[in-house]
Design a protein with these regions (language model features):
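Short, glycine/charged-enriched secondary-structure capping and boundary segments
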Residues: 35-38, 81-84, 146-147
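A short, gly/pro- and small-residue-rich
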Residues: 33-51
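Amide-donor transfer/coupling interface in amidating biosynthetic enzymes
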Residues: 1-19, 23, 46-63, 90, ...
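Short glycine-rich anion-binding loops that position phosphate/pyrophosphate groups of nucleotides
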Residues: 26-29
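Class I SAM-dependent methyltransferase SAM-binding "motif I" and its flanking Rossmann-like core
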Residues: 87
Length: 165
């Protein structure tokens, strides 16, 4: 866990101290990061977190640190690398696949297809996984330096990787 700060010197110290970074779930990624406008369907975002994580990601990427994103984290990484997001899945990507599951949250709700020759396929040696899902934003257009490694039944991108790293 890192302190929430926009102090560039503290962020530089964190990058120099840590071997890698996990960008986690949480509030929405602010649409301005991927050149969109906020709509009434957008959820809460945290400008301070977006600013800190943008600087942190930039420095960590520049220094070739290990970076992993989960949920909001993968969406954030895609956005700061030049990709776009669906601001609200219900209105921008209506589908039969449940991406905002009800309780219990630990029970898989849908499956994802793992792309052949992806790091995830090589790691798990499987073509599909059952997953939980609790988000209303998602990757829309993949950033130029990223590739898809898993998609849901409705074609929504569920996992990305950077082949150059």
């Amino acid at each position: 866990m890192l302190p929430l700060t926009e102090d560039e010197e503290i962020i530089k110290q964190l990058v120099n101290t840590c071997d890698g970074f996990l960008f986690t779930g949480g509030q929405d990624v602010d649409p301005k990061i991927y050149n969109e406008v906020r709509t009434k369907q957008c959820g809460e975002s945290c400008t301070q977190r977006d600013n800190m994580e943008t600087e942190l990601f930039s420095l960590a990427y520049e220094k070739d640190k290990s970076i992993l994103g989960i949920c909001r984290g993968i969406q954030f990484i895609n956005a700061v690398m030049g990709g776009t997001l669906y601001r609200d899945l219900q209105t921008e990507h209506p589908t039969y696949t449940v991406h905002h599951q009800p309780h219990p949250y630990d029970k898989p709700i849908h499956s994802v297809k793992i792309m052949k020759n992806s790091p995830l396929h090589k790691l798990l040696n499987t073509d599909a996984l059952e997953v939980t899902s609790l988000h209303h934003q998602a990757v829309k257009d993949i950033a130029p330096n990223l590739e898809c490694m898993a998609v849901s039944e409705d074609g929504l991108i569920e996992a990305l990787f950077a082949p150059c790293l």
